[in-house]
Amino acid sequence: MWICPICKTTNETNICRSCGFDLSKDYAMHRFLCQLSASGRKIFKPVQPGDNILMASSNTDYVFGRKMDRTKITTIYFRNKKENIGEDAWDVSEKQNGSIMAWTEENRDGFKDLYLAANGNILANKDCSKLFSGYEKLKKIVGLQYFRTDQTENMSFMFDYCKSLASLDVSHFDTSQVTDMLGMLGMFNNCERLASLDVSHFDTSQVTDMSYMFHECNGLKILDISNFDTSNVKNLSVPLSEYLAVPQEYV
């Protein structure tokens, strides 16, 4: 038995069942494990708010560093509090400091729900390429407002082949730093069930590649790209209007 130094919860396993602190982890913020004190508490430097940076996850054979079939996940939950952490939780922070924990739970449909939790907002990695690519059975993303993208430089194929995703709120996405050469290449490629998508606020002034950005988004009825700045786009492949299979409204 030990007492978590963060939330003071009594635990039996190495991972705190409330906040996800890992007793056996060599935390990057401290670099060594301290000896247990007489009170049973472990001392380490607390994670700072700016450390909630999510790891990159561009290998579609993995889910944030863990070998897993992405097509088995139907819902992704972003949480701004680390509580009720699952027993199979693993560290998905870029710095491996325990600031962001992930776990899965079986749902009623026989598939899995994926949870991502941190104390505060989750900061997107600079490289978000293929972050959600290949989640073909993914129906919804809950709590995406807790996911900040203001430091992200590459969003290529970010939601590629999310073929079952019926709605997606990216209205809060900050794309001002998207400067990578691939930029927004195939960002929403094959999101065929999306009926609407609000990208009207996207800052595309530094993006050089928008190829296949909305390719095969056959379900889209309304798409507002009137504010898109394509002055630096070197590769558009085909005009944006031709990505869409049905008549669209451009507000």
Regions found by a protein language model. Name each.
Residues F21-S39:
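Short microdomains enriched in Cys/His and/or Lys/Arg
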Residues E12-N14, K137:
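Short glycine/proline-enriched coil/turn segments at helix->beta-strand junctions
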Residues K8, G20:
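Cys/His-coordinated zinc-binding microdomains
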Residues N11-E12, L23:
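Cys/His-rich microdomains that often coordinate metals
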Residues C16-C19, A28-R31, K140, S167, ...:
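Short linear functional motifs in flexible/disordered or boundary regions
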Residues A38-V251:
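Negatively charged
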Residues I3, I15:
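The −1 position to Zn-ligating cysteines in a subset of zinc-ribbon hairpins
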